[in-house]
């Protein structure tokens, strides 16, 4: 019997726990995620998607953004949440008393909790310049791949990612540590490096045109490599041979 999974990282986990026959069948990207060349404008627009799941790193995104660009009109952050947003502004890192919601404290942060259909999501990606995704781990990770497919510079942890080669110079360092969310994610997690996220967000802000050109140039190749038909044919070709 075979075990099927979505990434090389997941396959290694299964193999390390005693499953010798593991097949990797990655997710693909739909053609609607068309590439768009982003150019420097008066405002650099950051995007984070993943709330309210703590594993997606939304709170770290808010902390770093407000530290670097809080209330700076040249930069904005949009958080797209599913129903609820859990990010908050705290008085400090010791007491951690809540001051309020990020969009109530900072005039350059927007939070979206409404449901979006696929076309609205594609437009949301196209309307923004940089995706910030300091995930603590994914089974595959659709959100960064969708951003990369549109040519968007993407700051993302990478050890778990099947498409890590496409994350390029904005790969975010992380450390494998014990999970702090045993109730939801027992075991190990990839904890993003806060200081490295600060460095990457600052660098992409100051050198946006260079990063935009780099990520746009590879977007067509991403669509080729993650074409659903091609991935499916590759995954099932051995099965086709057995029954043909």
Regions found by a protein language model. Give the residues of each.
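Short alpha-helical donor nucleotide-sugar binding micro-motif in glycosyltransferases
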Residues: 122-128
């Amino acid at each position: 019997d075979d075990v099927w999974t979505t990434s090389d990282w997941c396959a290694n986990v299964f193999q390390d726990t005693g499953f010798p026959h593991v097949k990797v069948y990655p997710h693909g990207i739909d053609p609607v995620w068309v590439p768009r060349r982003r150019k420097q404008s008066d405002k650099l627009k950051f995007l984070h998607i993943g709330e309210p799941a703590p594993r997606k790193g939304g709170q770290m995104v808010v902390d770093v953004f407000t530290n670097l660009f809080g209330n700076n009109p040249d930069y904005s952050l949009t958080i797209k949440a599913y129903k609820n947003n859990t990010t908050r502004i705290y008085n400090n890192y010791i007491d951690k008393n809540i001051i309020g919601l990020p969009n109530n404290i900072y005039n350059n942060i927007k939070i979206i909790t409404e449901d979006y259909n696929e076309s609205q999501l594609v437009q949301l990606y196209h309307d923004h310049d940089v995706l910030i995704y300091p995930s603590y781990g994914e089974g595959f990770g659709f959100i960064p791949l969708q951003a990369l497919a549109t040519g968007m510079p993407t700051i993302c942890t990478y050890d778990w990612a099947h498409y890590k080669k496409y994350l390029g110079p904005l790969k975010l360092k992380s450390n494998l540590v014990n999970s702090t969310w045993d109730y939801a994610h027992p075991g190990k997690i990839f904890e993003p490096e806060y200081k490295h996220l600060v460095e990457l967000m600052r660098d992409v802000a100051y050198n946006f045109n260079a990063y935009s050109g780099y990520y746009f140039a590879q977007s067509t190749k991403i669509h080729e490599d993650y074409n659903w038909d091609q991935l499916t044919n590759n995954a099932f070709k051995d099965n086709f041979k057995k029954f043909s």
